[in-house]
C-alpha cells in the first residue's frame, strides 16, 4: 500500500550518529524536569547516540504541529505501539511491543519525546525525540536519541551498531506511515 501511494520527496538533511547536541526550537507545551531542551541542557553535553532525518513528502496544507498531533492522538500509527493507549500524553507510561516500558517525557507543538524505563531491552534512561518540521511544503521527521548513562548495549560496539541500524529501519517505517497519514491530519 505504501509503495503505491503518491508522495513527492526532497532530500532530507543528512543523518548522523554521534553528532553534538543542538538546542531545539519551538514552543514548550510540556517539559519534563527541565530536560526538554535535550542533552546539552540536561546531561552536560552528552553526544547523540543517533540523529536520523526522514522526508515525509509534500504536504502544503498540513503543519508540523498537525503531523505531531496525528501521531500522539493516533499512537497506533507508531510501529511498535504495543500496549500503549491510542492517545498518549505527557507522563503516560506504557509497554511498547515486546514488553518494553517507556514514559512520555514531553509533547511539544512539533515534537514528542519518550524515555525508556527499567526493563526495556535497550536499558533505561534512553531518550528519543521525534521532531517535525516543514520547509517549502516538504515535511521532515528528525529522530534523535541520547542516554543518561551507558547501558550494556551501548557499551558493546556490535550491539550499539545493531541498535542504531534497527532504530534507523524502525523510524523509516514510522516516516513512511506518517507520509501517508499526514494527508488526513
Q: Where are the predicted features?
A:
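Secretory targeting and sorting signals
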Residues: 1-19
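Hydrophobic ligand-binding cavity/cleft-lining segments
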Residues: 21-95
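Structured segments of extracytoplasmic/periplasmic soluble domains
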Residues: 70-78, 135, 172, 176
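Hydrophobic-ligand binding "helix-grip"
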Residues: 98-135
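Short, solvent-exposed aromatic-acidic interface loops
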Residues: 117-121, 143-156
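Glycine-rich phosphate/pyrophosphate-binding loops
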Residues: 134-143
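A conserved amphipathic terminal alpha-helix motif
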Residues: 148-185
Amino acid at each position: 500500500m505504501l509503495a503505491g501511494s503518491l508522495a513527492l520527496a526532497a532530500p532530507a538533511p543528512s543523518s548522523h550518529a554521534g553528532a553534538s547536541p543542538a538546542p531545539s526550537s519551538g514552543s514548550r507545551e510540556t517539559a519534563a524536569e527541565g530536560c526538554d531542551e535535550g542533552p546539552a541542557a540536561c546531561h552536560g553535553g552528552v553526544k547523540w547516540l543517533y540523529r536520523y532525518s526522514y522526508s515525509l513528502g509534500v504536504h502544503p496544507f498540513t503543519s508540523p504541529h498537525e503531523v505531531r498531533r496525528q501521531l500522539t492522538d493516533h499512537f497506533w500509527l507508531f510501529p511498535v505501539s504495543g500496549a500503549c493507549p491510542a492517545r498518549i500524553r505527557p507522563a503516560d507510561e506504557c509497554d511498547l511491543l515486546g514488553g518494553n516500558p517507556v514514559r512520555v517525557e514531553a509533547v511539544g507543538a512539533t515534537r514528542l519525546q519518550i524515555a525508556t524505563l527499567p526493563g526495556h531491552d535497550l536499558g533505561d534512561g534512553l531518550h528519543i525525540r521525534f521532531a517535525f518540521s516543514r520547509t517549502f511544503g516538504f515535511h521532515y521527521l528528525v529522530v534523535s536519541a541520547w542516554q543518561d548513562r551507558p547501558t550494556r548495549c551501548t557499551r558493546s560496539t556490535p550491539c550499539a551498531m545493531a541498535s542504531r541500524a534497527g532504530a534507523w529501519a524502525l523510524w523509516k517505517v514510522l516516516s513512511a506511515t506518517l507520509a501517508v497519514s499526514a494527508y488526513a491530519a
